[in-house]
């Protein structure tokens, strides 16, 4: 179905309860409902937003268009968690219900401040001429989960500096001062990151500090979803540079999600990441974008990603549902690399550990499991996951120890990552996989492997010892 602009931007109150019930019934028919990933009840899920800790709970939002598998009039759906594994909806939704966000509640972030959770997000306004004006808007949630929007924008666009591509504010605290990064396209059509600070930490009064200096390379034509976090005294910038030259970072997806590690973050005469290293892919898989990371009150760093990509269709679209979020990953730095690994509480989903010899025979699974292989004393092999009795696989993983590579094969598409492979953990959740090499040195993710009803086994070209756990939430 091709959606017109009018259909995409129908107001929420124009849909009846009967319309919503029909959408829910259709979505339930999808054969690929996940077991331990966050996905929408109906419609499209994309960017994770507002990832934070407040009032003794983890908070998370996701961008949502409830009425179809397309990018339409967006809102935010609110979730809370005690353990970063089990998330529950609170019923709170940040709706596009003011003149400043009448064309959608776009991405943003959150920060616990005093007795409330402060939200900052991009509100898209469109007038009768359909010209877009992006405003950075604010809201706050109290300890009773009551939400109030600020009546006026916090940051207005300056079209002498940027185009209307000016979005995705990330608020963070550094050395007692509150700052905000905003992804943008400069008036010269280059990707930039704008930096602001809250004057005297007044969250309604922001000063433009200029652009963040972190690379001599041209950052494509637009930067989305910038995040700055701090790990063991180092500064880590995570962002999505659209149109990035592939000579800077090799990537095969429509848009990359990358990171850079620096020694320090400074403001004043220069707003910069000092001694910033090279850009590195955050994920070497097929579909990972719009990662949001933040520092918890104890300083630890976490991230969660949208397993999907803009301007992409999926088999679930016919059920009027699309998009999932990754597992929450804890972040660390080792040997000047960013490591990402599922939070420790994920282990509590494991059911009955099995030690198996996997060979060219089918071991039946539920397509909801964790598979672990210690490759230090084992041979190279080709793993077939989500396979049937004939050996037809939805996903293959080729481990080449001699050349230190791992290759993903999905429907004749391939992704290649270079790494000395000692250990591999594979998480499968129906149509989703997340693979972690060496406890997070490399990550390869995807939400577009759609096995048929007969593809639920695993096999290996060469015999290897594995550990296998079914995962139940």
Swiss-Prot record:
Disulfide bond annotation, renumbered to this chain: none
Main location: cytoplasm
GO cellular component: cytoplasm
The entry's keywords: Carbohydrate metabolism, Cytoplasm, Glycosidase, Hydrolase
Assigned EC number: 3.2.1.26
Binding site for substrate: 44-47, 63, 106-107, 167-168, 224
Top-level taxon in the UniProt lineage: Bacteria
Entry annotation: catalytic residues: 47
GO biological process: sucrose metabolic process
Locations listed in the record: Cytoplasm
Activity profile over pH: Optimum pH is 6.5-7.0.
Pathway it works in: Glycan biosynthesis; sucrose metabolism
Pfam families: Glyco_hydro_32C, Glyco_hydro_32N
GO molecular function, one term: beta-fructofuranosidase activity
Catalytically driven reaction(s): Hydrolysis of terminal non-reducing beta-D-fructofuranoside residues in beta-D-fructofuranosides
Top enzyme class: hydrolase
Similarity comment text for this entry: Belongs to the glycosyl hydrolase 32 family.
Entries under NCBIfam families matching the protein: scrB_fam
PANTHER family membership: BETA-FRUCTOSIDASE
Protein name (record): Sucrose-6-phosphate hydrolase
Organism of provenance: Lactococcus lactis subsp. lactis (Streptococcus lactis)
